[in-house]
From Swiss-Prot:
Encoding gene per record: pehA
Enzyme Commission identifier(s): 3.1.4.-, 3.1.-.-, 3.1.3.-, 3.1.6.-
Cofactor(s) this protein cannot do without: Mn(2+)
Name of the protein in question: Multifunctional alkaline phosphatase superfamily protein PehA
Cellular component terms (Gene Ontology): cytoplasm
Cofactor: how and how many bound: Mn(2+) is probably the active metal ion. Other metals such as Zn(2+), Ca(2+) and Fe(2+) can also act as cofactors.
Disulfide bonds listed in the record: none
Modified residues (3-oxoalanine (Cys)): C57
Reported pH dependence: Optimum pH is 9.0.
Active site: C57 (nucleophile)
Record bears the keyword Signal: no
Matches recorded under InterPro entries: Alkaline_phosphatase_core_sf, HdlasePehA, Sulfatase_N
SUPFAM superfamilies in the cross-refs: Alkaline phosphatase-like
Gene3D superfamilies linked to this entry: 6.10.250.3360, Alkaline Phosphatase, subunit A
């Protein structure tokens, strides 16, 4: 069998509605430029209704790379270990003869049963998932990146992260139109791109699998010149939110927790104060900076795409572009990837098949989830989808179209124990194991079920931005019950099935897959 190339591009915190190709399809003039992603969309298939199955980064990447829902892999938060028993994409690729290279990060904490409690990997946010070979890691503690910056002659400040302060500033109150202290030649996006080109050139045309990760448009929200001034605040869309933070907080106890505790310093290096009190001008400026960071990534991808063109590998490479999760960007008075709103969970997905362009430039409306990426790659390479995998291959969408038995709802989860702020379990008075929610969403309704808090129910046709909770409305009681039953059925049908197809028999071990 002819060996094939795979380029899996995973950006960080890029939400789905910041994709110009989708804006044009909706008749809207794009407010940012991504010519290289536009090319990928023209030559590939763009999935409009794609979600990460969980947030934040560590859990989201665990789902992406294991094909498992959060309820099954249970790496429920950043720094929570991933059970060693779960097969991941890296290990599965090795089993079919690939040496999966990784640039970026997976934010994986190792299983403590496989090592010592003194393992240095337990002192950092995350490490590289087993099975992948790092050829340009960000982790641990961004040491690879900062070392590269220093090696190239840039003098790092005493606090290395001060490179993300605005030029000439020692502190910043929030959103800024000033450039980062770090020039674009030494930005983290450039670092990852240089590592990618070095790796690809070293392959000398041999087949490859490359996970190419980027840190942006993740905070801190400050961009290197000229990207800091590429977009004007007044050209950015206004935030979608209630009249004031108190009105937003009244919707649900979890919403109130985040409104009360979200801090600017998590998004603007050196800033202080509440993130929920950003005014509209600050939010528009934040979005302009966010777009600048996106365009910088797009320029970097252009360099990678150009190399594949020049070496004749573009038409031989499956390219998948996606993000780990989205970003609230001031919508609902929130920042980050939290809660239950669409802005945190809806993410880009673009797939360009190698030489197969039957649906080039089209937009797929079917419901896809991040857990579908792993089986898609394995099937494309001739491998098998692990039985435990919750996702399904998306390859049929690239050929004959959506299968008749495809899912009719989106599913996603959030475990909000001790996330980023002041321990939600304390402010909402829950045990850690009760700090979870799951969402069932279709084209008409969205149901949010909490382990130990009141549910939420939204009519997406009448209320697409999720302001009016109908869970307590008697007129919707039957629908709320139906969607609660759907949530229960979904969880039952996706319980761990790693070994459930095996049987002992007089003939020995047998299997039954259907």
């Amino acid at each position: 069998m002819t060996r094939k190339n795979v380029l899996l591009i995973v950006v960080d915190q890029w939400r789905a509605d910041f994709i110009p190709h989708l804006m044009r399809a909706e008749g809207r003039e794009p407010f940012l430029k991504t010519p290289n992603l536009d090319r990928l969309c023209r030559e590939g298939l763009t999935f409009r209704n794609h979600v990460t199955t969980c947030v934040p980064c560590g859990p989201a990447r665990a789902s992406l790379l294991t094909g498992l829902y959060l309820m099954n892999h249970r790496a429920v938060q950043n720094t929570v270990p991933l059970d060693q028993r779960h097969l991941n994409l890296g290990k599965a690729l090795r089993a079919i003869g690939y040496d999966p290279a990784l640039i970026g990060y997976t934010t994986t904490t190792p299983d403590p049963r496989t090592t010592s409690a003194r393992d240095p990997r337990f002192t950092v946010l995350g490490d590289i998932m087993d099975g992948f070979r790092s050829v340009g890691a960000f982790e641990p503690n961004m040491e690879g990146y900062f070392g590269w910056v220093a090696q190239n002659g840039f003098e790092l400040p005493e606090n290395r992260e001060d490179i993300w302060l605005p030029e000439g500033e020692h502190s910043v109150p929030g959103a800024t139109d000033k450039p980062s202290r770090i020039p674009k030649e030494f930005s983290d996006s450039t670092f990852f791109t240089e590592r990618a080109l070095t790796y690809l050139k070293g392959r000398d045309g041999k087949p490859f699998f490359l996970h190419l990760g980027y840190y942006r448009p993740h905070p801190p929200f400050v961009a290197s010149a000229p990207y800091h001034a590429m977009y004007k605040a007044e050209d950015m869309p206004a935030p979608i939110r209630a009249e004031n933070p108190d009105a937003e907080a009244a919707q649900h106890p979890l919403m109130k927790h985040y409104i009360d505790h979200i801090r600017r310093g998590s998004f603007f290096h050196g800033a202080e104060g509440s993130g929920a009190t950003l005014d509209e001008g600050e939010i528009r400026q934040m979005r302009a900076t966010y777009c600048g960071l996106i365009t910088e990534i797009d320029d970097c991808l252009g360099r990678v795409f150009a190399y594949l063109d020049e070496t004749g590998q573009w038409d031989d490479t499956l390219i998948i572009f996606t993000s780990d999760h989205g970003e609230q960007l001031g919508d609902h008075h929130l920042l980050g990837k939290i809660g239950y709103n669409a802005e945190s969970f809806r993410i880009p997905l673009v797939i360009k098949d190698a030489g197969q362009n039957r649906h080039a430039g089209q937009i797929e409306e079917g419901f896809s989830e991040s857990i579908d990426v792993m089986p898609t790659i394995l099937e494309w390479l001739g491998g098998e989808t692990p039985r435990a995998c919750d996702g399904r291959s998306l390859l049929p969408f690239l050929a004959e179209g959506k299968p008749s038995d495809w899912r009719t709802e989106l599913h996603y989860e959030f475990d909000f124990r001790d996330v980023f702020y002041d321990q939600p379990q304390n402010s909402v008075q829950l045990s850690q194991d009760d700090c979870s929610l799951c969402v069932i969403e279709d084209e008409n309704y969205k149901y949010v079920h909490f382990a130990a808090l009141p549910p939420l129910f939204f009519d997406l046709k009448a209320d697409p931005h999720e302001f009016s909770n109908l869970a307590g409305d008697p007129a919707y009681a039957a629908l709320v019950r139906d969607y609660a039953q759907k949530a229960l059925s979904w969880r039952l049908s996706h319980a761990d099935r790693t070994l459930t197809h095996y049987r002992s028999s007089p003939q020995g071990l047998t299997t039954r897959n259907h």
